[in-house]
């Protein structure tokens, strides 16, 4: 009985140790053209609790950061628990709904083998005066894939 109990405790400890090694991580601090918060919507300089979308973009009521280039530069930071990425995948979509389904209708970079933390857009032509959304995930080791980041509008 005592051996069974000790074996059970050892097994649970082992599982907890393994579980700590395979943690849920995702990229953070996403930037578009080096802007940290291009998705913030402001009114008289105050950040509003609104998500940047095409309707807000078309009104002159709010202040926003407009990304006008057709090839924006995307940057990100690894999760604090990660050491180094060996590759990444970037998705750009015309709607947050598509992006939440992991569909990049404008660009799916596929797996890019690189340790870089930035990538120039290389998808379908972007139009000015339109809102787009992007997210990214990375591989830390060949067998370890992070979760996708939270979507970011630009």
Q: Where in the sequence are the language-model features?
A:
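Bacterial N-terminal signal peptides
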Residues: 8-14
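C-terminal motif of bacterial Sec signal peptides marking the signal peptidase cleavage site
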Residues: 18-19
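Extracellular acidic, Ser/Thr/Pro-rich low-complexity tracts
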Residues: 78-84, 140
């Amino acid at each position: 009985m005592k051996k069974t109990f000790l074996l059970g405790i050892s097994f649970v400890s082992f599982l907890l140790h393994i579980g700590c090694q395979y943690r849920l991580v995702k990229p953070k601090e996403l930037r578009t053209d080096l802007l940290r918060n291009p998705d913030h919507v402001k009114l008289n300089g105050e950040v509003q609790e609104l998500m940047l979308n095409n309707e807000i973009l078309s009104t002159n009521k709010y202040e926003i950061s407009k990304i006008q280039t057709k090839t924006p530069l995307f940057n990100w930071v690894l999760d604090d628990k990660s050491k180094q990425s060996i590759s990444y995948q970037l998705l750009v979509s015309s709607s947050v709904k598509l992006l939440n389904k992991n569909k990049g209708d404008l660009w799916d970079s596929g797996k890019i083998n690189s340790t870089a933390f930035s990538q120039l857009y290389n998808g379908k032509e972007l139009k000015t005066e339109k809102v787009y959304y992007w997210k990214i995930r990375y591989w830390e080791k060949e067998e370890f894939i992070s979760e996708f980041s939270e979507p970011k509008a630009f």
